[in-house]
Amino acid sequence: MYVLGLMSGTSADGVDAVLVDFRGNLNKPRWKLLNSVSLKYSVDLQKAIIDAGQGSKLSGCDWLELSEAITEAHFSAASRCDPDGISTVVGCHGQTVCHRPPKPSFRGASWQLIQAPLLATLLGKNVIYDFRSKDLALGGQGAPLAPFLDYALIGRGKTWRGVLNLGGIANLSLIPPLKGPHRKCHLLGWDCGPANTLIDLAVQKITNGQMNFDCDGLMASKGKPDLDAIKKWLKEDFFQQPPPKSTGREYFGSLDLAKRFSEINSANVNDLVATITCFTACVVAQDLNNLFKKSWIKPAELFVAGGGSRNIFLMKEITNRSPGIRVLSTEKIGIPSQSREAMAFALLAWWNINQKPINTNVTGLKEPSVLGIAVRP
């Protein structure tokens, strides 16, 4: 079955679209990536999305116009990715503007802006969307969902395999080995903490909006990280919390960045970016080290995807802080680093059409469930 997958992540920089052919066993499908397209949001649309996610007061009409603009961008990306219209169904994540993980005192919830009926009508295809709500309603974190793609498409090997996504948020998947004492272990996955969310905000603030991100990590490479500040940050509650856990821009946004800037013992702009970038690497390394201490689980390979995989400074920091782990791009296994999450929602749409439930181990939902809501054109 030809499936379109559409994803716009926490960085809110645009829409990634993929066209994938899935066939065979639902648990271990044969697959082929036929096309991929990345469409950038306009500067104004990106700013509107980020402001909305950080508490900007909007009227009902403002929300309506924002969701329409996001839907039109998704339609454009889908049309470019599948110009001949060969796809049968579309898996669309939408644009997250609020993700609230569950706590003992309140129910979890997540809101992705997209007008799915409009998108289905424009494309003339069934659209599967709202993948997180059912998971949250059943007590799960609602995120991350991409680990299910890693398990199905990358698969198991002789040792534990890790997949790290460096989008707006850094999240990990750990795939158990085929043999050995850990062969009966479950797939693991969780959000580690901020990645491009804080790094991009830092660059935008320092350059007064003249730059949107640190290309290749050049600014960070010229600076010196404040390791004392990072050591303090790693003791915060979220980073001490065991999986399953999830987070978003609501926690790691402009206010959080301002607080961290005030705690860095340097006013040098390159030092500021280096510290925020190194913080992401330390968050990931701490999670991997804690897991090894508690469960003797350590991946031999760590495949990295997302925009952060192109940040040379960040990749070096992760490699240096993860001894004994081979760090490489998902490109090495045929999954473009920018396409992984869009492929995940294509897979979830295919599973929805075939009524395949996901398991409970990654997000913590109480029972297996089919994720997503279907809308016809």
Swiss-Prot record:
Sites where the protein binds ATP: 9-16
Gene3D superfamilies, per the entry: 3.30.420.40
Catalysed reactions, semicolon-separated: 1,6-anhydro-N-acetyl-beta-muramate + ATP + H2O = N-acetyl-D-muramate 6-phosphate + ADP + H(+)
Pfam families per UniProt: AnmK
InterPro entries the record matches: Anhydro_N_Ac-Mur_kinase (IPR005338), ATPase_NBD (IPR043129)
MF annotations from Gene Ontology: ATP binding; kinase activity; phosphotransferase activity, alcohol group as acceptor
Any single biological process term in GO: amino sugar metabolic process
EC number assigned by the record: 2.7.1.170
Pathway: Amino-sugar metabolism; 1,6-anhydro-N-acetylmuramate degradation; Cell wall biogenesis; peptidoglycan recycling
Keywords per UniProt: ATP-binding, Carbohydrate metabolism, Kinase, Nucleotide-binding, Transferase
Root EC class: transferase
Physiological role: Catalyzes the specific phosphorylation of 1,6-anhydro-N-acetylmuramic acid (anhMurNAc) with the simultaneous cleavage of the 1,6-anhydro ring, generating MurNAc-6-P. Is required for the utilization of anhMurNAc either imported from the medium or derived from its own cell wall murein, and thus plays a role in cell wall recycling.
Similarity comment: family membership: Belongs to the anhydro-N-acetylmuramic acid kinase family.
Name of protein: Anhydro-N-acetylmuramic acid kinase
